[in-house]
Amino acid sequence: LSNAALLPAIAQDVGSAEDLGVMEINLTDAVRFNWGFQGALQGAGTPNQAGIGGFLPLSVGDNSVFFVDALANVNFSDRNGDSSIVNTDVAGTTISTSTRLGYRWLNSDRSWMYGVNAGYDSRPMNTGNADAFIRDAKSVSDRQSVFFQQIAAGLEAVSESWNFNAYGLFPVGDTEQVLNDHYLGGALSTYGLDVGYAITPEWDASIGYYYQHGDDLTANDANGVLAQLGYEITDGLTLGVNVSYDEAFETRVSGNIEYRFGTGNATEVEKKTWQTPVIQALTESVKHRDVRVHDANVKVKEVEVVQVCTTKTIKLFGKKETKKTCTTYTTTPTSKTYTEQ
């Protein structure tokens, strides 16, 4: 065969989505329920954790999917003397949850996937000692178990080479709570954008910017950067490393692992086209699900007990008597003041 005869065949391997056969894929075959396990090491305001998750397509169209993505993780203790929330060590064990309701769709030639999602995350948190006290062989007192929660929203766009992810995390409910006699903890609002690039079919890298802020004493407003590198070892098994920096948490390095069953629905003949980043993105788990917590160094003081006395003189049978009445005002559990150290 001449070189000219080979050119059309070569072009089909590196051409458009239609040339690659993506247009022939039936999404009902590619978009199915999948579930699996995930785990992560502690990061900037996030715990050591491992759990189970699942992706459930509620409705699959010709070019779209309406879905629920849910996770439940067991949260473990921080490394001793290395707090994930800056000062107070997180103690195990609690169970956090995350749920997303979303819609993803392909453009007309299936070269891009777009998505929108929103949901709710919860995080109970037990507290241990504080790093500064551990170094001095001391201990904080009145350690509390607290509960934080947030609502979240995200936007996605994925092509064969590029991926974009914008997200917002918005704490709700009691966003600041007493952790112990020295520290107050608060859930952080976080807004971010990640831009990723598929280096090879197995390697994916991204760089992101985020802005975080809290309420009152745990404000810690800060701009941050997040670099991520992921490697797909086999179908469904992915390892990742993450490096972040901001003024509140400074540099944090963490790792993550994820395995999903039910991701190999295509036949071997279809496997190459079915596993393109655009088609795979339709069933990937939504990113940025953790309730991020930061603590602040404060002195928790009970309101002082106050005794108020009144004296009244009365005349009884021609004799004067003085009667003293005292009222004591005591502290209630909510009567606490917080002052910066």
What does each model-found stretch correspond to?
Residues 38-41, 76-89, 129-143, 176-185, ...:
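Extracellular loop and loop/strand-boundary signature of outer-membrane beta-barrel proteins
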Residues 39-45, 58, 72-78, 105, ...:
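Transmembrane beta-strands of outer-membrane beta-barrel pores
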Residues 46-52, 91-97, 112, 147-151, ...:
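Residues that define the transmembrane beta-barrel architecture of outer-membrane proteins
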Residues 52-56, 99-103, 153-159, 193-197, ...:
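Residues on the lipid-exposed face of transmembrane beta-strands in outer-membrane beta-barrel proteins
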Residues 61-68, 108-116, 161-166, 201-207, ...:
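Repeated loop/turn-to-beta-strand initiation elements of outer-membrane beta-barrel proteins
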Residues 138-216, 224:
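Detector for outer-membrane/organellar transmembrane beta-barrel domains
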